[in-house]
Amino acid sequence: MAVATHCFTSPCHDRIRFFSSDDGIGRLGITRKRINGTFLLKILPPIQSADLRTTGGRSSRPLSAFRSGFSKGIFDIVPLPSKNELKELTAPLLLKLVGVLACAFLIVPSADAVDALKTCACLLKGCRIELAKCIANPACAANVACLQTCNNRPDETECQIKCGDLFENSVVDEFNECAVSRKKCVPRKSDLGEFPAPDPSVLVQNFNISDFNGKWYITSGLNPTFDAFDCQLHEFHTEGDNKLVGNISWRIKTLDSGFFTRSAVQKFVQDPNQPGVLYNHDNEYLHYQDDWYILSSKIENKPEDYIFVYYRGRNDAWDGYGGAVVYTRSSVLPNSIIPELEKAAKSIGRDFSTFIRTDNTCGPEPALVERIEKTVEEGERIIVKEVEEIEEEVEKEVEKVGRTEMTLFQRLAEGFNELKQDEENFVRELSKEEMEFLDEIKMEASEVEKLFGKALPIRKVR
């Protein structure tokens, strides 16, 4: 069971595009044209996927669906300053420009215009340092770019969580802490009642918390977002009479058929009045709280031993996520206990046949050459055809540049001109930490142009 952290940041869509040259096709959906000495940037709508599962399977929408969205999308034109103009900017203004462009490239295209402007304003006002660090960090920038592929999908939340799974690191955590918890730039997802607290009568009436001691595998899970990862081996030990500590680990599959391992420590306290309820509260990161409900268990020191846990939780970004898992001593779900599990699942209105069996063979990662061959084989058939057709669409849209109405990105670009008049106030507002960060990164004008003139690589993070 993975830690639920829906936020600004758990695999990422395999057909994101970047532009690496002035007239090229890129994976982020950004094209650049130089007209009368000024760079114009076009933001293309993100390609969306109909299905994204933790098993690593991908099912993308057909090209015709993408082309339809392409032709109907709004193409926003942003005049960028020239290199000479950039060189005249001071470091504080460069930092603010980075923030504006980050919003334009990575946040605004994915959301409603009004909400996006509110989010950008919040980030630029309250999370300048964290935003700048995120854009300068490949994993964090790739994570935000990955999120754009989730926009308006039926499984938008699940897709966002999978992005976080792939690109999680300390910079992402710091950005989330500011944007989600401290400054609340992201609205909290409300509880839709999908995972209600179960009636106490369906829980085990007696449970010795020490029975959780030792190593357990998750061999079956309800929620594909949190529960169905490979190689879920969790080791528990008790502290005192009613405290349980779990060292949990799971594997995240990557797009090239590889994987890397995530781990976390979770601490639970047993409810003194309901032995079948365990609470994991008082966590700093996103202030998440998980409640575990034990539906059924059998402890006989045999391979068929199991503990069936249903859970629900909340954090600063999402109230009401949940799922259910079956812990077994065996790495494979024993068939002999399935009737008991079916009965327990039915008690909370769930069908156990919909649960997903996990793969706990925990084998080695495929050789790099095998992963590359598989990735190339799966992608080369799509790339040639789509590049040709997308280039044709791009050229048609470029002809419409002169007739483009004022858009959100034009307003952002106009805001850049105001930055030049606001330098004195901006410098006065900078904190000591922000000034130290500016000195630390020593971001030159050419580096800013390079950062936003080329693609942010979405790559496997080790």
Swiss-Prot record:
The organism's taxonomic lineage, starting at the top: Eukaryota, Viridiplantae, Streptophyta, Embryophyta, Tracheophyta
Gene Ontology biological process terms, A to Z: chlorophyll metabolic process; fatty acid metabolic process; response to heat; xanthophyll cycle
Keyword tags: Chloroplast, Coiled coil, Disulfide bond, Membrane, Oxidoreductase, Plastid, Thylakoid, Transit peptide
Subcellular location, principal: plastid
Membrane topology: Peripheral membrane protein
Name recorded for this polypeptide: Violaxanthin de-epoxidase, chloroplastic
Species this protein is from: Arabidopsis thaliana
Reaction it catalyzes: all-trans-violaxanthin + 2 L-ascorbate = all-trans-zeaxanthin + 2 L-dehydroascorbate + 2 H2O
Quaternary structure annotation from Swiss-Prot or TrEMBL: Interacts in vitro with LTO1.
Membership in a protein family: Belongs to the calycin superfamily. Lipocalin family.
